[in-house]
Amino acid sequence: HFSRLSTLRGLPEVRDVRGAGHMWGLEFAGAGARDGAAVACEVASRCFAAGLLVLQADNLIRINPPLVASDSEIEFVVETLCAAVRETLAAS
């Protein structure tokens, strides 16, 4: 699942995608008038609207799915996060 998140690395405002086990993080860089923190905040808001809670701190988003999460739940996390990032960057 982490390899799917890694595909976000090529996007212009995604500075880094990193993770170990079930702890993953995305770091955002600013572009134009928006700084990385604003991008991360918008991504977190889109995730929340879709039913996914993520931790946003400054320009970072951290995801910690439970170790007992099913494959379908992990798939939901990855799909929702990827969609939120792509929608946020497309709107800028």
Features from the language model and the residues they span:
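Conserved N-terminal phosphate-binding loop of PLP-dependent enzymes in the Aspartate aminotransferase
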Residues: 1-92
